[in-house]
From Swiss-Prot:
Protein name: RING finger protein 207
Chief location of this protein within or outside the cell: cytoplasm
Binding site for Zn(2+): 98, 101, 127, 132
Gene Ontology CC annotation, any one: perinuclear region of cytoplasm
Residue stretches of biased makeup (Basic and acidic residues): 553-562, 607-622
Organism field: Mus musculus (Mouse)
């Protein structure tokens, strides 16, 4: 049972068909019997999982995720939510007996059998007339059995009193005696059942929207991965065709190299194909889980009463939140391009033959290259790296080669005073500065992303704007450095004509420098994309935080206001009375806040009074650093 039911994946339609019924076990294909929930949110019957645990760990038959199990049974706990849905789905098909005469009524007799919502008992037609004939039963709510209400008042298991309250802190139903036994602090979290039901429905709706968004993203990721698998197949075919075409013209000298290149392509294809299919299998097992839980939510809302909703609804919300917050690999881990660098390999193989001909066969006219233009012709027919063509547009580039650093160090260690040596010294300094700035931005964005996803911290939108501004400025600097480096190509090509050996080393270093700048710019572009994607969520979370917790409503620019207060107090240094008046004026609350929604005057003043110690502390710190001039403010 290693996920074989998801093996024949031919498209999204196959994934939809593999989802199955939410109340049917994927192993035995029957209705759940005491369903057990694993850590991967897959459910199975108790009998289907019995005996599968090994060393306290239970592998999911679908996705192979390990679940820790405790106890001698070796089974996870029973899924109360799914068990409720199973029991509720069978209510309509179960035989009902009259509470008075024990007459069994089938489902076909649902219209001729009655149910007293007041008594909470089913009655046949004859017993209804006999037992509820008296006037004292006139107010009883008697309906047809098929129309009976599910909002039956449940009673507390401890005090046998009806539930009237719900604790939002402990997520539990309370009767009047449970409410009286609670402490005063806990009573503040108690609301009536109707209000708790409305709040719970709103929170469940938000959780369902998050799951639907994840479902949409998963479908898009699956479609992308399926297309990339096809692209890998086409790319491998194209690469093999190119290798065969080049091999045909040099068959005698490159027979061994041909086999090596084909083996390289095949290994890359197998690696990428395996990686994409593994990720596709993982997402294929995730999509049915999302669909099943969405159906569970819909069924739960239609079947559960208010008390049952409050009893199991928060468990459902936690489960949905757990599904959404789990790490899901929705983006491809690598590209679908297969590159064997066959031209360079063939050039190395034919290097002895190429060295026999004349070295200077191409002139240096038009050697300069622009960011958007084509590649310039190489001076020599050497196995050096090709000039980049339009790579600054964001296409994938290679990572910095360690060989470039070693070659640069060797070149600088020779101590020769040449134009290229001076260029390398200047380039290394500027490149290190750009690399440090990019790394700092990467670390800052990673830290903010971790705080946002794991710690759910409130991040100011100004921080994201500053990161975006620095990223755009850094992109301009890298583009300028790249253009400056590209503009020196013609100068260096004239020098490279003097010696082939020196040209081979210098060109390799030069192209590696260009690739390093391309890598830096690509990383910076990724930072810019991530920052733009995170910024709307941070602003949205900030607005929600400000509305839910007024203590987060601080002035728009506390530092700017503080600086303005300092500026206003400067003319009053010669007048002690003016200083006191200015300080009193600066301590008045400001009506602006980060919240977009207008708030009542009371909470706003309280929030700003809460911030006064911070402003006063800032004033004291500024006065302490002003030396003797601060004596006027301290007075």
């Amino acid at each position: 049972m290693s996920g074989a039911i998801f093996a024949p994946l031919e498209g999204l339609s196959a994934l939809d068909a593999a989802s199955g019924h939410p109340l049917v076990c994927p192993l035995c294909h029957g209705q759940y019997e005491r369903p057990c929930l694993l850590d991967c949110f897959h459910d199975f019957c108790t009998g289907c999982l019995r005996g599968r645990a090994t060393d306290g760990r239970l592998s999911c038959p679908l996705c192979q995720h390990q679940t820790l199990v405790k106890g001698p049974s070796g089974l996870p706990p029973v899924d109360r939510l799914l068990q409720f849905l199973v029991d509720s789905s069978g209510d309509g098909s179960e035989a009902v007996r009259c509470a008075n005469c024990d007459l069994e009524c089938s489902q076909q007799d649902a219209e001729t059998t009655y149910f007293c919502n007041t008594c909470g008992q089913p009655l046949c037609a004859r017993c209804r007339e006999e037992t509820h004939r008296a006037r004292m039963f006139a107010r009883h709510d008697i309906v047809a059995l098929g129309q009976r209400s599910r909002d039956v008042i449940q009673k507390c298991t401890l005090h046998s009193e009806p539930y009237i309250m719900f604790s939002t802190d402990k997520k539990s139903l309370l009767c009047i005696r449970c409410f009286r036994d609670m402490q005063g602090e806990s009573r503040a979290h108690c609301v009536d059942l109707e209000s708790a039901y409305v709040q719970g429905c709103e929170r469940l709706e938000q959780a369902v929207l998050a799951v639907k968004a994840l479902q949409t993203a998963t479908k898009e990721a699956i479609a992308l991965l399926q297309s990339m698998v096809e692209e890998v197949r086409h790319s491998a075919a194209e690469e093999e065709a190119a290798i065969h075409a080049l091999f045909g013209s040099m068959q005698d000298r490159m027979a061994e190299r041909k086999a090596l290149l084909l083996q390289t392509v095949q290994s890359q294809y197998e690696e990428k194909d395996k990686a994409f299919k593994e990720q596709l299998t993982h997402l294929a097992s995730l999509l049915p889980t999302l669909q099943v839980h969405l159906v569970i939510c819909s069924s739960f809302l239609s079947l559960a009463s208010k008390a049952e909703f409050l009893d199991l609804g928060y468990e459902l919300m936690e489960r949905l939140q757990g599904i959404v917050t789990r790490p899901h690999r929705l983006r491809p881990a690598q590209s679908s391009k297969i590159a064997s660098d066959h031209r360079a390999e063939f050039a190395r193989c034919l290097e002895p033959l190429l060295l026999l001909g004349p070295r200077r066969e191409v002139s240096t006219v038009g050697g300069a290259n622009t960011l958007s233009g084509g590649s310039s012709p190489m001076v020599l027919k050497t196995p050096s790296c090709p000039s980049p063509v339009g790579k600054m547009s964001g296409s994938p580039v290679q990572k910095p080669s360690p060989h470039r650093f070693i070659s640069t160090k060797v070149l600088l260690a020779e101590g020769e005073d040449t134009p290229f040596t001076e260029h390398c010294r200047h380039y290394e300094d500027s490149y290190r500065g750009l690399q440090v700035e990019v790394q700092n931005l990467k670390d800052q964005v990673q830290e903010l992303h971790r705080d946002l996803t794991k710690h759910h911290s409130l991040i100011k939108a100004e921080i994201m704007g500053d990161i975006l501004r620095r990223s755009l400025l850094l992109d301009t600097q890298i583009a300028s450095e790249y253009a400056s480096l590209e503009g020196r190509r013609a100068i260096f090509q004239e020098i490279w004509e003097d010696s082939y050996q020196r040209v081979a080393t210098q060109q390799e270093i030069y192209e590696a420098q260009l690739r390093d700048l391309l890598q830096l710019r690509q990383e910076n572009a990724y930072l810019t994309i991530v920052t733009k994607q995170i910024t709307p969520y941070i602003r949205s979370i900030a607005r929600v935080k400000e509305r839910l917790e007024p203590r987060f409503q601080v002035p728009v620019d506390e530092h700017a206001e503080h600086g303005q207060n300092m500026y206003d107090e400067t003319p009053g240094r010669t007048d002690p009375g003016c200083t006191t008046e200015k300080r009193d004026k600066a301590s008045e609350p400001n009506g602006s806040s980060w919240s977009l929604s207008s708030l009542p005057e009371g909470p706003s003043l309280k929030n700003q009074d809460h911030l006064r110690p911070k402003l006063e502390a800032g004033d004291e710190g500024w006065r302490a650093g002003s030396g003797s001039k601060g004596a006027c403010y301290q007075a």
